């Protein structure tokens, strides 16, 4: 059952101080029986040597206790920004557990479009990786918990004190009906962002304020079209990228009623749904001609190079911008997707532990490591997401991240079908299939009807 998220971030800062001082005075002339002043330095040196030895033995013991063998980490983080962020998790883990050999089992394809099929085949065949990338909500339950592939990690939350350091509603989205928690989240993405090339817009006399309406976007798109510049960068070789534009239009058109699409309280034949589809179709009139040949990150690269002006994408796109050495709010800008300024479209990333993990000790150590403060403060600035923990230091994050943190704290959080939280896998695929057909025929009524049928087939229609 979908768990609705509406959360508030609190930020805790930790300060550590270290003090050390040591001094002694030399003795006068030696006497037959040495005075106490002479023996103090020797005793101190002996104590220091014993302490150093104990420290070395402790470090050696910790290294020996580090889990060994291979640890297979399955994910679909392959773009430049994603790979850099994943490497940060690997580095943090290796610092803590140097005896483990990490196998980076990565499958290319945004939003897990290819990875899901590979992973499901392996899980069904009894050949699981130790840990795999996952999203909370419907995806976690339907794909992994209900079939019995996932192991609970509730004990880690209790032992490490994580329940006090994670948004309650986020934890609930990882908690199954048996009361067990089945995932660890490493970052929280915002899916309703509209990114733009600031310099390109400035060259054409276009300026964006604090908000942008749909009509204002269309006006800018027309201005760019006159200059033979595609307004919208799209890379839908994986159709989910185009489906995300529709998702944002649905949030814009339905507002607070949007989550009702996924629990059956709002019909896909609602007039607001058709309005959203019409706006989606209108936006596609301004997309780049080579959209079907590009992946989402290639579309982001096209924006970076000035080949088009805007892209609708979750803030994993931020990772591509900084990986290309672009500067926040100088080379690129961002704004709420038109009409969604009071909402946070949540796409959370994390990992699930295999029930029959080949190396359970190393796998559990991975789950512990990725939810540590050092790991999340290293991973999220590169990935574009904000910490899943509530105690990360805001000073370690840039302008965009702090903007996103504020949005997460104050706006209404809604589930994403692209991010796996809103609907089961079959429903998600039907949504993608409907979008695929719409990109070809632009038939508003047909798409609305196909989505309504998909909801009925999933048992969540009115």
Predicted regions and their residues:
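Conserved C-terminal helix/tail region of periplasmic/extracytoplasmic solute-binding proteins
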Residues: 43-52, 57, 148, 202, ...
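Hinge/lid segment of periplasmic solute-binding proteins
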Residues: 58, 65, 135-191, 218, ...
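Extracytoplasmic/periplasmic substrate-binding proteins
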Residues: 76, 90, 139, 243, ...
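Mature extracytoplasmic/periplasmic domains
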Residues: 77-80, 84, 92, 148-158, ...
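Extracytoplasmic/periplasmic substrate-recognition and gating elements
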Residues: 91, 95-96, 101, 125, ...
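Extracytoplasmic "Venus flytrap"/periplasmic binding protein-like
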Residues: 92-173, 203-205, 309-310
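Extracytoplasmic/periplasmic solute-binding protein
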Residues: 177-186, 192, 218-265, 308
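Glycine-centered hinge/linker elements that transmit conformational signals in sensory
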Residues: 220-223, 263-293
